[in-house]
Structures are given as C-alpha cells and as structure tokens.
Amino acid sequence: MAKGSAGDAPNTRDTSFKRPKIRESCTHCSSQKIRCTKERPACARCVNKGLLCQYNISRRTGTRRHSVRATPEPETTISNAPTSSVPPDSVKIDGKQSPAMSDFALLDGLETFNNSLWHQPITTDIQDIDMQYFDFFDPGGYQAEPEPINSFDIDSTLLCGTSTAGYLPELDAEASTRPSSSSSPPSQRSDGGRATTHGGGGCISTALQIFSELHVSSSACPIAAGAPSHNIREFDHVLDSNRAALEKLSSILDCPPCCHDQEVLTALFLAVQKALSWYSAALDVAGDGEPTSPSSRVKSPPAFLGSYALGAQAQTLARAYVVMAQLQQHFQPLLAKLQRKSSLSALGARSSSTTSLSSVSSLQSSTSGSAVIECQKRALQEALEDVVAKIEGIKRG
C-alpha cells in the first residue's frame, strides 16, 4: 500500500520549466561580433577596457516585429532561440560575405531598423568637433574619446541650431568592418612613430600621392583623355581605399616636423576632402532596378541577408549605415586631429613674429598659408554638411 502511494504521489516539481540559457559571450563582445574569452564573472576584454561585463539570457524577449518577406516562414518550437536571428556569415554580397555589410550584420535583421538609431546628429562644423561618441548599438552607452585632447587649447564647444552638434555611433577598434592594415605604411613608420621619407618627397609627397589616387580627372581634361578610366569603383573598394587613405593621412599628422607645416596641412585637407567626396558618391549608388546615372562613380552588386535578397530601400539604408560607421571610426578622428594641428600651426606662426625684415616676409608667407588652410576648412565643412544631408534624406526615406 505504501509502495503504491509513493508511486502515485504527484510530482510537485514543474518539469515544464526550463532554466534560461545564459549566452556564452558577454554583451559587449557579442555586440561587436568578436570572440569572447568567456571568463566569469567578467571576461578579459571587459576587464582590460574597464567595461561592465554582463552575460545575458539568450532567449529573445518581447514580441517580434513583423518583417516583410516574400513567403511566410514556418513557426518554430525552439525555446532557446539565439538573440540574433542573423548569423554574421549570412550577410553577403554576390554569394559571399561582404566586409562592407558586416556593420549591417551588427543589427538584428531588417526588423531591428528603427528611426531612433538615426537620432544621433553629426557634428558638421570642423571647428567645433568634440570627440565624444554615443554608441547606438548599446542604448545609454557613453564613452569619451580614447585620445586625450586636453593638452591642446582648442575650443571644442559644440554649436547649437543649424550645426547638428552631435555624434556618430561608436565602433570599437577591435570590431573594424574590414581586415585592418597598419595605421601607417612601412615606408612612413620608424621608431617613435615618426614618419620617414616616402618616395624621396617626405610626408607632403605621400599626401599628394593619396590625393592623386582619390582624384577623378574630368573627362574634358586633354591630358587625362588618353589615360585609362577608373572612375567607376565598387562600393567595397571605395570603403577599403578610403580607410587606407585616412590611416596614412593620420600617420602624417604624427610626424613632428611636418604636422605643423602649412604646405603639408594644405595637402592633407585636399586629400581628406577627396576621401569625403567618395563617401558622398557611395551614398548615391542606384538601387536594384533603378537607372544608373551617367555621373555615378560607385556601383554595388545586389545584397543578400542569408538567402533573402534585400530590396532597393533596404540596400540604400544598409549602405548609409556602413558609410556612417566608417565616418565615425576613421574620418571624424582624423578631422579632429587635423583641426588641432592646423590651429596650433596658425597659433605658432603668429607668436613667432618679430620686427626683422626677414621675419616679416616669413610672417606674410605664413599668413597667406593660413588663409589657404581656412579656405580648405570651409570647403571641407560644406562637403561634410552635404554628406550629412544625404544621410538625413535616406533616414527619412
């Protein structure tokens, strides 16, 4: 009797309850799509960077938003669905993953596109760039610029009103969208990070060479008429060449004797403006099925999310996200450094004036060079505002 009672006793333990599965990678490593060392309670990367390391539940929470699909997907009964419905290697262009789309893979599929991600304005006045960023992949996250700038007496007060005083999203240096090359070419690197001569012409030769590589000659130019045309470039190639060019230009600014030379700074401003013009052209890529403009300089093959072909609007939005991310990661830090160096150069030219005839002539030359640099700053600011306007237009749809 006792045996029967023991066998028939109800099981008070709820077998339908399953303990939530904890993700193997921490939140920060997962959001940056990098390998986590998985130490508990905090991984080595978060400890080194002073970040709050958290291991979240892998189950998706909340109600999944409807996404527009050609065919409905069958319902799934998997209880431990991963947080991201899109594996990193599922985003590809032309049958393989495109490095340019890996920024887009940070987002949780098309349904996670939200207008709130675009509400971070961009600083367009290069005189007022303050290197502080908001991370729109980490809500509420705020970090200061890793490179200290308090040693320079530069006013970084943000403008109000029409200057859109704000920031691009932060991307960790370890989560570069492409295989990262050295920040400076071997021909420019030496002990102490000092740039050495390149091609016999030094830093100014390197800056002018970068300008030449990014420049597109006019079809009406009689000298360039017989040269082979490379005006049309792939979207991926534009991002690769711009990233490499900006890294080389940044290394020139680390050269003590050249970073204050006004001729070198003028060449740097010209090269930076050419790089920005390619970002602008990358935002003008015609979508699938749309006619290609004769003046278009950038083309992009169809993009896929897994086996799903993205529509024209989704591709345009994805390209804008990638351009926006690279502007923050490579362009804006270089622009801030260039602004500081040019301001210090102008300040040094004014403080070195004396009453001698030779110094007066030198001062006049420095003043003329400063005026040229100021013109370049205004032109660069107008070009940056144009890129921001294009991104805003894409955001509004």
From Swiss-Prot:
GO terms for molecular function: DNA binding; DNA-binding transcription factor activity, RNA polymerase II-specific; zinc ion binding. InterPro entries: AflR, OAF3, Zn2-C6_fun-type_DNA-bd_sf, Zn2Cys6_DnaBD. Residues 62-92, 173-198 are annotated as: Disordered. Pfam families: AflR (PF08493), Zn_clus (PF00172). Residues 179-197 have a biased composition (Low complexity). Residues 74-87 have a biased composition (Polar residues). Coiled coil: none annotated. Disruption phenotype: Blocks the expression of the cercosporin cluster and abolishes the production of cercosporin. One of its GO terms (biological process) is aflatoxin biosynthetic process. The keyword DNA-binding applies. CDD domains: GAL4 (cd00067). It is found in: Nucleus. Transcription regulator of the gene cluster that mediates the biosynthesis of cercosporin, a light-activated, non-host-selective toxin. The perylenequinone chromophore of cercosporin absorbs light energy to attain an electronically-activated triplet state and produces active oxygen species such as the hydroxyl radical, superoxide, hydrogen peroxide or singlet oxygen upon reaction with oxygen molecules. These reactive oxygen species cause damage to various cellular components including lipids, proteins and nucleic acids. This is Cercosporin biosynthesis regulatory protein CTB8. It comes from Cercospora nicotianae (Barn spot disease fungus). The gene is CTB8.
